[in-house]
Amino acid sequence: MRKVKVAILGSGNIGTDLMIKLGRSPILELTSMIGIDPDSDGLRRAKAAGYYVFDGGLQPFLESGAELADIVFDATSAKAHILHAKALREAGKFAIDLTPAAVGPYVVPSVNLGAHLNETNINLITCGGQATIPIVHAIGSVSPVSYAEIVATISSKSAGPGTRSNIDEFTETTAQGIEAIGGAKKGKAIIILNPAEPPILMRDTVYAVVDEGADRQAIVKAIHQTVAYIQSYVPGYRLRSEPIFDENKITVFFEVEGAGNYLPTYSGNLDIMTATAVKVAEEYAKYVVGIGTSM
């Protein structure tokens, strides 16, 4: 099977971790890393690994020729992606947006990836969205969810400048994803940066309100099936306890431990984004090559 060529836009923590994960993919061939800081660790590592390096931003990469990549991962910022999206679309690239910009449709692999493989730009929502929306959707597959609230708690050390500058976009985009993809009638998202030492793992809580008399056994089964699917590409994703029921309210506690490729294991919030991005790209690559997908 031929590999599909990809490039990374953004040489920060997320882009660098993505570079390591892509190096192990049997389907994707990383060719290039694009950034704006020639002294960044990401660009230095990319150069040492033999990839093409562009330190003048997206335009020099696009001017170099179309053959370098069919897929471009954007790991910059929400504001930057709005500009990048237009240029990538005009160049005929499939863009996987790891920022909260949401230019393209929201995608959560366990819920709706198969519906968007013919798009030119898809959005991975946020780390909190990738962690929690599948749980909301699992609950909603059994009983309508009238309200869902998620709380994503991450280590302060895992929140770099990009994360901190995108806080407002994080809460807005995640809440929209809870409703649009999770299926909740009303959604709310909260992010907490915890300065504890040693740094904590990413911890998430989902609160959901369902119909009276909803089938609890079926809800628990749906949650466990969803967790197992996510673990196929994010092994550190796990429940911290069994779902808790209080009349028609459900509380689910879980955590995400990173794989430790480039980022520390406590940076599960970043790891779930890079692992999800690779999963989406591999499914898209199967689609364009014509061998079918697992979706």
From Swiss-Prot:
Gene3D superfamilies: Dihydrodipicolinate Reductase, domain 2 (3.30.360.10), NAD(P)-binding Rossmann-like Domain (3.40.50.720)
Record EC number: 1.2.1.10
Coiled-coil ranges per UniProt: none
Residue sites binding NAD(+) per the record: S11, G12, N13, I14, S158, A159, G160, P161, G162, T163, R164, S165, N166, N269
Gene Ontology MF, one: acetaldehyde dehydrogenase (acetylating) activity
Pfam name, any one: AcetDehyd-dimer
The family this protein is said to belong to: Belongs to the acetaldehyde dehydrogenase family.
Protein name per UniProt: Acetaldehyde dehydrogenase
Organism: Brevibacillus brevis (strain 47 / JCM 6285 / NBRC 100599)
